[in-house]
Regions:
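NAD(P)-dependent Rossmann-like dehydrogenase/reductase catalytic/cofactor-binding core
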Residues: 166-221
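Conserved residues at beta->alpha junctions
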Residues: 10, 116, 189
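C-terminal substrate-binding/catalytic lobe of Rossmann-fold NAD(P)-dependent oxidoreductases
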Residues: 30-186
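A glycine-rich, Thr/Ser-enriched phosphate-binding loop motif common to dinucleotide/cofactor-binding enzymes
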Residues: 4-15, 63-66, 197-203
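Short, solvent-exposed amphipathic alpha-helical segments in soluble enzyme
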Residues: 22, 128-131, 203-207
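Glycine-/Pro-rich loop/turn segments that contact NAD(P) or position catalytic residues
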Residues: 1-35, 39-49
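Short, contiguous clusters of charged residues that form electrostatic/catalytic patches at enzyme active sites
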Residues: 14-18, 70, 74, 172, ...
């Protein structure tokens, strides 16, 4: 048997890891506080009872917070080659997460506060978000969006109804960046939980593996 098992992160982690990757690369991260407002489609079908979610917020999603608190560090960590084994050394910043379910069909919204290792200005953080180009762009993957992320300057954006389907649901939207009186900065991250966070991530992984020559043609005759 030839192949590999590729695991995707939690769909909420996708919307968190993207802006954290930029901040870690540019300024370094010390601490992160995140509260998620997760769409009901993330619970699958039939999902959450209409009587439970209609006009309500459910402040608990089983096993969700522990995933969000550990996965970003692992994703942004580094690979270390040992004898006959490759291990992951997670990044050292701390993540504190609260995950909630809200009456929205599609689109996870995250309220994120960060403490950076190096002091910087609001303008430089905006510039880092606006100018970021992922290294995977060189592969020109078929399912990848033209814009990996976009930064919105309107006070009331991003919103699931207006922004979750941006570029067929594959673009992550950031906005409401402002100083945080407790940490350094706070902002909103929004992405489509099933298109960018779950199914789309799986397809991108397969396309990436093919582009990197990791998939072999199999003759099943």
């Amino acid at each position: 048997w030839h192949g590999a098992i590729v695991t995707n992160p939690n769909c909420t982690t996708v919307m968190l890891a993207v802006p954290l990757a930029i901040l870690e690369e540019q300024f370094g991260l010390e601490a992160v506080i995140v509260t998620s407002m997760q769409a009901i489609s993330g619970a699958g079908y039939p999902g959450v009872s209409a009587l439970d979610i209609e006009g309500n917020v459910i402040p608990f999603i089983r096993n969700e917070e522990s995933k969000v608190e550990s996965e970003s560090n692992k994703i942004l960590g580094r690979l270390v080659k040992g004898e006959n084994v490759i291990s992951i050394v997670p990044e050292s910043f701390t993540v504190s997460a609260t995950c909630t379910r809200v009456p929205v069909i599609d689109g996870h919204t995250l309220s994120i506060s960060v403490k950076l290792k190096s002091k910087t200005s609001l303008e430089r953080v905006v510039e880092a978000f606006q100018n970021y180009k992922p290294k995977t762009m060189v592969y020109n993957l078929p399912s990848a969006p033209k814009h990996f992320l976009r930064f919105l300057e309107e006070d009331d954006r991003p919103q699931p109804r207006l922004d979750a389907e941006e570029e067929e649901g594959m673009c992550i939207s950031l906005g409401r960046l402002r100083p945080c009186p407790i940490l350094d900065f706070k902002f909103i991250s929004l992405g489509h939980n099933t298109e960018r966070g779950a199914a789309g991530a799986s397809i991108l992984n397969a396309e990436m593996a093919l582009s990197m020559g990791m998939l072999k043609e199999v003759d099943n005759r």
